[in-house]
UniProtKB/Swiss-Prot annotation:
Originating gene: AKAP3
Subcellular location: Cytoplasmic vesicle, Secretory vesicle, Acrosome; Cell projection, Cilium, Flagellum
Extent of Basic and acidic residues compositional bias: 219-235
Disease: Spermatogenic failure 82: An autosomal recessive male infertility disorder characterized by asthenoteratozoospermia and multiple morphologic abnormalities of the sperm flagella.
Official protein name in the record: A-kinase anchor protein 3
Record keywords: Cell projection, Cilium, Cytoplasmic vesicle, Flagellum, Phosphoprotein
Domain commentary: RII-binding site, predicted to form an amphipathic helix, could participate in protein-protein interactions with a complementary surface on the R-subunit dimer.
């Protein structure tokens, strides 16, 4: 959108809004700017993890249904439990998870159940569950110890079941306790009080309570030994005791009327049995579990390598543990280093000669380093200021590089290094701009059309000269005067060169006709100038006269007698008509026509010859030509050139002194003329429908026209096919312009699907009001750009649903972009007025627009 848009008065209709839902086989190619803030990155990762978990649950379990898994051992029918998992992610946020575990008692099939071959498996699973609980308890003990610094603390964990409400917990707590709760419940159901084979494990179902609450307690005791010597530190020995507490459901509640009411709770604590558990799990296993948990936490934090500022519980715990360990290790290291240094250098520091020698050495090294630094700085300053001058485009790009570096430095943790990094990034950007090779320019519409015009024109003239050479022959060619036009040999090919501005004239002796060649520069100028003036003629006449009539009128134009003389070696001189070639005489000598156009253009052109080595193209003449095309002009033909008068088509052009043009036109002039042709062609293609609307249906008989968003009157600017060679060149040029402009008309090329516009906003810390305003402005901008449907992805505030309803209502009512923006401004004024008075706005932006739009 290069042109200015009056948003408040825009009459474009609003587009529809939909939720983006990619297919199963559709790849998502997201392109977005990632933030350098670690808090946002961690938040995004956590949200992605929650979404992935929800998708996995949706695949395995259907919404609203439960998954019950019953496991029972054929050898031991007493054990059996089922896990019911209710998927409620589609109804609420991922934090609202319901996890329920039930216990089923399978009655005995015989009077006594034998363990048989399954006793060994039960024993292994029993101790594995106990060991897992121990590792988890040890990890929690160490984390709490590192945070609070308490040595004697009891880690208490309980799992509530049944009809008791689950306490409100965050998702991170639920994730961290999920494994422990599951293992605890399994060990409770699988192993009631003792290990298998202990004598009282195998009993009837009446001996074990039907509903139990499981609690695990970790106690730490310290025992201090007596000191053996005066310098010995008091050694401390920690003993770990692990026991399980069972609570009977029948003892806690009394059943009254089919409901459970809480009563005085009684806890049944079993005595510590060192022969049962603590004797089987040795002290080495507990120490190993403790070291494994510590190493695991350290390795996780080393892998992450981030600075955590989030309030997540797990990250805070790990950070504090690491900080405390690091402080202790660094403190011990510094103390030992200083003690060793003092013991070694204690005697040397008292020696004055040694101290003076050390000072001299340090001073000499420091002076040398300072000298090197100053030399480097001065050399850099000299190179920047005197040796290598920075080009103009690099100086313009320097501000952009500095602003980019400043933006990229936001979010850095250490503010002290900000200036250093900023200078390094700016210097790197500047060096890349200075020493990098210039990028190749993209193929623009002007370059494409200019190449096409010159190539077609050179091919046309080559064919014409081949016919002349065959009919006349070189033996009849005579050079009568210095102004006689030279003719090329039949074996010369005028293929279009790669660089238009660097066309050069090969040396040739004028006395040998077989070595004669046309100057490619002049032929390029002839063709471009002819196309330029023909297009200007169409602009002036509004397409009401044929291009051939203008060619014939220009061929009989009388020029003033006081024109400056032309150098004899110029290859675009006027040639006398060839006698004997009746066909060429009937069609007029186009070379003389081109020459006349050039001579006239030297006095009237749209470009000024500046004194700078690189002339710049002004934009004002283009605007004048645009106005000339937009308003309907008089249909009377322009006056022919008489004396010093200029034609009506060139009346608004800028004067240029003829003395500034020498005999041979430079490549820069060729480039300027080519740009003028292109700008006028673009003007015609965009805005020639104002004065040609009446001719749109009369002369539109060409069936080969392409259907596009352009009006039919555009083709009235095109001359009829086959009316002349110059008209054929213009026909091809207009067609190239038309094809080029199709890409910007809003319609995709044939065979290509329309692009899909998807908006994904990630404003985690922004308010709901700002998010709604951002979504509305994105919708309005897409409507102004004629986007059919705007898709939104990644919404958690309910904005999508409201915006869908608003867009559907606006489309039904036929609202425009200007009406929507005016409504938004009214809402903002009301909201600011309410805030100034102290009132609260009752409705949000989307709700207010639904009511008042």
């Amino acid at each position: 959108m290069s042109e200015k848009v009056d948003w408040l008065q825009s009459q474009n209709g609003v587009c529809k809004v939909d939720v983006y839902s990619p297919g199963d086989n559709q790849a998502q190619d997201w392109k977005m700017d990632t933030s350098t803030d670690p808090v946002r990155v961690l938040s995004w990762l956590r949200r992605d993890l929650e979404k992935s978990t929800a998708e996995f649950q949706d695949v395995r379990f259907k919404p609203g249904e439960s998954f019950g898994g019953e496991t029972s051992n054929s050898g031991d029918p007493h054990k059996g439990f089922s896990v019911d998992y209710y998927n409620t992610t589609t109804k609420g946020t991922p934090e609202r998870l319901h996890f329920e575990m039930t216990h089923k008692e399978i009655p005995c099939q015989g009077p006594r159940a034998q363990l048989g071959n399954g006793s060994s498996v039960d024993e292994v699973s029993f101790y594995a569950n106990r060991l897992t609980n121990l590792v988890i308890a040890m990890a929690r003990k160490e984390i709490n110890e590192k945070i609070d610094g308490s040595e004697n603390k009891c880690v208490y964990q309980s799992l509530y079941m049944g009809n008791e409400p689950t306490p409100t917990k965050s998702l991170s707590k639920i994730a961290s306790e999920l494994v422990n709760e599951t293992v605890s419940a399994c060990s409770r159901n699988a192993a009631p009080d003792k290990a298998p084979g202990s004598g009282d494990r195998v009993s009837g179902s009446s001996q074990s309570p039907p509903n139990l609450k499981y609690k695990s307690t970790l106690k730490i005791k310290e025992s201090t030994k007596e000191r053996q010597g005066p310098d010995d530190k008091p050694p401390s020995k920690k003993s770990f005791f692990y026991k399980e507490v069972f609570e009977s459901r029948n003892g806690d509640y009394a059943r009254e009327g089919g409901r459970f009411f809480p009563r005085e709770r009684k806890r049944f604590r079993g005595q510590e049995r060192p022969d049962d558990f603590t004797a089987s799990v040795s002290e080495g296993i507990m120490t190993y579990a403790n070291s494994v948990v510590s190493d695991m936490m350290v390795s996780i934090m080393k892998t992450l390598k981030i600075q955590v500022k989030d309030t997540t519980i797990a990250t805070i715990l790990l950070k504090k543990v690491l900080l405390k360990h690091a402080k202790e290790v660094v403190s011990d290291l510094i103390d030992s280093f200083l003690r060793n240094l003092h013991s070694v250098t204690g005697t040397l520091m008292t020696d004055t000669q040694f101290v003076s020698a050390v000072k001299r050495t340090v001073f000499s090294h420091g002076s040398q380093k300072a000298t090197d630094i100053m030399d480097a700085m001065l050399r850099k300053l000299y190179n920047v200021m005197f040796a290598k001058k920075v080009p103009e485009h690099v100086r313009k790009a320097q501000d952009k590089a500095e602003s980019y570096s400043l933006i990229s430095m936001k979010g850095m943790g250490d503010p002290k290094n900000r200036n250093v990094n900023f200078a390094m990034k700016s210097e790197t950007k500047l060096r890349e701009k200075m020493y990098s090779e210039p990028k190749s320019e993209e193929e623009t519409c002007a370059k494409t059309l200019g190449e096409h015009i010159i190539k077609e024109g050179l091919t046309l003239w080559h064919k014409t000269q081949q016919k002349e050479c065959k009919s006349l022959g070189f033996q009849h060619a005579a050079f009568e005067a210095p102004n006689t036009q030279r003719k090329p040999a039949s074996d010369i090919s005028f293929e279009y060169p790669e660089d238009i501005g660097n066309l050069s004239l090969p040396p040739y002796p004028p006395e040998k006709p077989e070595n004669f060649m046309y100057d490619s520069d002049s032929w390029a100028e002839d063709l471009i100038v002819s196309a330029l003036l023909l297009i200007q003629y169409h602009l002036a006449q509004g397409g009401r006269r044929d291009a051939r009539s203008f060619v014939e009128a220009a061929g009989t134009t009388n020029f003033p007698a006081n024109e400056p003389p032309v150098a004899p070696d110029e290859s675009c001189l006027k040639s006398a008509p060839i006698v004997g070639d009746q066909e060429q005489a009937e069609k007029k000598d186009l070379r003389s026509v081109f020459f006349n156009f050039i001579r006239n253009l030297l006095s009237e052109t749209i470009f000024k010859r500046d004194q700078s080595p690189e002339p710049k193209v002004p934009e004002q003449p283009v605007k004048e030509d645009r106005k000339l095309c937009e308003r309907p002009l008089a249909s009377s033909p322009p006056r022919l050139y008489e004396d010093d008068e200029t034609p009506g088509a060139l009346s608004g052009l800028t004067k240029m002194a003829v003395s500034q043009i020498d005999g041979h036109m430079s490549g820069q002039m060729v480039e300027h003329l080519m740009n003028s042709v292109m700008k006028l062609c673009v003007i015609i293609a965009k805005s020639c429908d104002a004065s040609l609307a009446e001719l749109g249906d009369d002369k539109s008989g060409d069936a080969s026209r392409l259907t596009s968003a352009f009006p039919d009157s555009l083709y009235e600017c095109l001359p009829a096919k086959g009316t002349g060679s110059a008209e054929a060149v213009l026909q091809n040029a207009y067609q190239a312009i038309h094809n080029e402009m199709r890409g910007t008309s809003g319609q995709p090329p044939e065979g290509c699907a329309a692009p899909t516009v998807i908006v994904s906003n990630h404003n985690l810390t922004d308010t709901v009001q700002n998010k709604q305003l951002q979504a509305v402005l994105q919708w309005v901008a897409a409507s102004e750009l004629n986007v059919p449907i705007l898709y939104f992805a990644g919404d958690d505030e309910g904005i999508q649903e409201k915006l869908l309803q608003l867009s559907a209502a606006a489309v039904d009512k036929g609202c425009s972009v200007g009406e929507v923006l005016q409504s938004v401004l009214r809402y903002e004024k009301e909201r600011q007025l309410n805030e100034a008075v102290g009132n609260v706005t009752p409705l949000q932006l989307l709700d207010w627009l639904m009511v008042n739009l």
